[in-house]
């Protein structure tokens, strides 16, 4: 018996003012099954129970692109989106499922993970998504990626300042970086404001909320690109995390 994901139509509506179509829900289910299968070889995620997967992977991914509970309008119009350090494909694959007019580039430095995501994209027939084996510090200096994206997504594993350095160089003027975080402090606000300013960005919103099933604390930071990023950013691989701005 296959584990079925919950539909949660009411929660989607209440928290994002949106709910998935039948075909999007079917793709969510297919994604879940593929991740469970891939997990046997690759250790992609510890989150495998249906409700937990729905909340911590699907809902969490999409809540980030819905600041103050409204989906970013450019996603429906045809944005160019990049997901940095996508891992098992979050948040980028769920975003690709719901934003069929947008193009999503999924970046990770681990080739095995990207090979697995290629399988997912093929199985789900997600023609609006593509993958790239690289690091943010490298592509941020490449003309085909620098200042080419409308939206940059990153699930923060450390402090926010390196995330600002990974994302802002990739954005066009007016573009939006979304940094997904758990807890957040006022001290971090000061440091990320300083980093963003040096990188041509400004902190537009710090959205704090709780997840709908387990009431876990979440924060999403939204940085707007308001000026060109100086040419020396991003710095070399490893430097942003070792020596944050």
Swiss-Prot record:
Binding locations of S-adenosyl-L-methionine: 85, 90, 108-110, 136-137, 155
Xref: SUPFAM superfamilies: S-adenosyl-L-methionine-dependent methyltransferases
InterPro entries linked: rRNA_ssu_MeTfrase_G (IPR003682), SAM-dependent_MTases_sf (IPR029063)
EC number: 2.1.1.-
Domain of life: Bacteria
Annotated localization: Cytoplasm
Record keywords: Cytoplasm, Methyltransferase, rRNA processing, S-adenosyl-L-methionine, Transferase
Primary location group: cytoplasm
Keyword rRNA processing belongs to the record: yes
A single GO molecular function term of this UniProt record: rRNA (guanine-N7-)-methyltransferase activity
A matching Pfam family: GidB
Gene Ontology CC: one annotated term: cytosol
Family of the protein in this entry: Belongs to the methyltransferase superfamily. RNA methyltransferase RsmG family.
Protein's name in the database: Ribosomal RNA small subunit methyltransferase G
Organism: Nostoc sp. (strain PCC 7120 / SAG 25.82 / UTEX 2576)
Gene from which this protein is expressed: rsmG
